[in-house]
Amino acid sequence: MKPSQPLCNRIVDQLITAMIQNRPFDAVLASSTVAKPWTQQLVSDVLHSIPRFFFISPRSIGRQKGFRHRSPLKQRNLSDESQRRRSEVLVLGPGAYMDPKKVSIGLQKALEFFFWIETHFGFDHNEITCRDMACLLAKGNDFKGLWDFLRQVSRRENGKNVVTTASITCLMKCLGEEGFVKEALATFYRMKEYHCKPDVYAYNTIINALCRVGNFKKARFLLDQMQLPGFRYPPDTYTYTILISSYCRYGMQTGCRKAIRRRMWEANRMFREMLFRGFVPDVVTYNCLIDGCCKTNRIGRALELFEDMKTKGCVPNQVTYNSFIRYYSVTNEIEGAIEMMRTMKKLGHGVPGSSTYTPLIHALVETRRAAEARDLVVEMVEAGLVPREYTYKLVCDALSSEGLASTLDEELHKRMREGIQQRYSRVMKIKPTMARKEVVRKYFHKIDGNQNFAMEEI
């Protein structure tokens, strides 16, 4: 019989509490556990809960994922991080604020739990639970334990069904996200040891991890290997999209003009090679290249790609139009940006969102066109969107400086304040600890009298 969801939650809480209290996983704990029978979902829930209590510090609760960081991801060096912690130097990146002692306890308890349910309850681990345990060891930076665990599990009778290509691919993705790209590459080359054969998804995963740290030479080597005549797993559209997107993003992150020119040239060359080999670019491929061209002031090439995608029947979406709107807003070609937004709505290619209106409003305010900025804010709110706190304050200040403060309806003010306050409350539930002022700042100011509201600027 499958345990109910409230019962599963109680069991997870009970086991996590036992881990925090450092209680041994023995027959005494087994007798007090009411999970009969154990299910794969319940075991996965326990393993997924361990990082939240042992790997994450209060200061990093609610932090953005690595792919949202502006700075390029770098290959992590555990010995260097350990030296920095001993010297009380701030460690940045995925390993920030991790307490090695807590992580070690969490890994120890996770392994005890993994083998405890086998011994006392006769639970047969499958591919999913072994994959979750391997990813847990990777997130805890225990690579020796990870290799030993995979070797031990793969040598079992059902080892071929437990350690599969899909599970190794998921592990490589986890290692890449944590900044351990060399370890992910080592896992890729160890697949044969675990009786697995890499497929196109495994190649795409390791190429993506290599591109994230800027190792394009190795990524191109793997792509060339996939392009060999008769290779079992040739590249697909996603393989080329990974490289095109990475060339554009990594070039802009370096901040070097020469590097930007080189990377954009490589991205366009990869796009032409993709067409030459008979692959059809999708909207994601076009969006990556168009966004890179817009952000590097290559608007002619971006418009050429835009027309090309429409000619080939690839329908642009909101992301495509937002790239042009941001470019036109930054260069003060506001009429072009507004025309792009109206075209998107007219052709039904997307619905304007906050990321569409915000650059337009900021550009109008900077060019002292507060009345038009106010009209866009009204249109935005009537569409069910809430402007950012900074955008709201910017428009209010611009209207006041031009003597148009009374033209914005009080009911509209109220709706925006309520939306801002609701969003602020949601953020506070996700990230209750705001120790770093560059992450979240709170401002209190008055608008139209005695009403205060908290403004969060990210």
From Swiss-Prot:
Q: Does the keyword Transmembrane apply?
A: no
Keywords carried by this UniProt record: Repeat
Q: Which domain of life is it from?
A: Eukaryota
Q: Where are the PPR repeats?
A: 164-198, 199-233, 236-271, 282-316, 317-351, 353-387, 388-419
Repeat recorded as keyword: yes
> Which PROSITE patterns does UniProt cross-reference here?
PPR
Family, similarity comment: Belongs to the PPR family. P subfamily.
Tell me the protein's name.
Pentatricopeptide repeat-containing protein At1g77405
Q: Which organism is it from?
A: Arabidopsis thaliana (Mouse-ear cress)
